[in-house]
Regions:
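An anion/pyrophosphate-binding glycine-rich loop and adjacent beta-alpha core
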Residues: 1, 5-102
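Ser/Thr-centric signal marking residues that sit
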Residues: 14, 125, 134, 169, ...
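A glycine-rich dinucleotide-binding beta-alpha-beta segment and adjacent secondary-structure elements
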Residues: 86-166
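Predominant activation on well-ordered alpha-helical scaffold segments within soluble catalytic domains
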Residues: 23, 27, 86, 109-112, ...
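Short hydrophobic core segments
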Residues: 11-16, 156-158, 181
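Gly/Ser/Thr-rich beta-alpha loop segments that engage phosphate groups in nucleotides
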Residues: 19-22, 138-139, 162, 169-173
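A conserved FAD-binding loop/helix module that cradles the flavin
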Residues: 165-191
Length: 191
């Protein structure tokens, strides 16, 4: 089954892969898909989301005119971080040492296509020890909503990430932990 999501955010390219707010938000769904499908997931990243294809093509053309005597690797220095350029050129099947003034219109179009859809293969998630948020835990069906007391065990209360709830990044999970902790603690104190 195909699954897609159009989201806009800042991504972070790290030594182990991609990270950042949107990656963290997608990680629960991606982890479930990886587990269910037993196959890698292809992520397409628009490296220039503020520009339409046509505007990006014009921008690349201007840069290529400015750096016409440079190698392709150096002719893209104003467009991308230096360490990302070889990755993009590799996906566009372009030689980084090729002079910019020898890039054909078709090659330039292929480059823009990669800039608008860099393909990254997701092979897994980071280990639990590195998790910022975890999914899973005690089902909310087994918990009294106002007191956070167990419906199955008298005197047992739950709070935070032991409960099967999780939210997007941005403090929602911390707020859930604080609020459920307060509610469970207050209820337990008055038991």
């Amino acid at each position: 089954r195909d699954w897609s999501s159009d989201v806009c955010s800042s991504d972070l390219f790290t030594h182990f892969g991609v990270s950042g707010p949107i990656i963290l938000s997608l990680s629960k769904t991606v982890a479930a898909l990886l587990k269910a499908n037993k196959t890698n997931i292809d992520l397409l990243i628009d490296l220039k989301p503020a520009l339409t294809f046509e505007k990006l093509e014009a921008r690349v053309q201007r840069d290529f005119e400015q750096y016409s005597r440079k190698q392709l690797l150096n002719g893209m220095k104003d467009l991308l971080p230096q360490r990302l350029i070889p990755v993009v050129l590799d996906q566009a099947y372009l030689d980084e040492e090729k002079p910019v003034n020898q890039i054909s219109k078709e090659e330039r179009k292929r480059l823009v296509e990669v800039l608008k859809g860099l393909s990254v293969s997701i092979t897994g998630t980071r280990p639990l020890a590195e998790a910022i948020v975890t999914a899973g835990g005690v089902s909310i069906k087994e918990i009294e909503p106002k007191t956070l007391r167990s419906k199955l065990w008298q005197g047992l209360y739950f709070a935070g990430e032991v409960i099967d709830i999780d939210g997007y990044t941005g403090g929602y999970n911390l707020q859930a932990a604080f609020s459920t902790g307060y509610a469970a603690g207050t209820a337990a104190a008055y038991q």
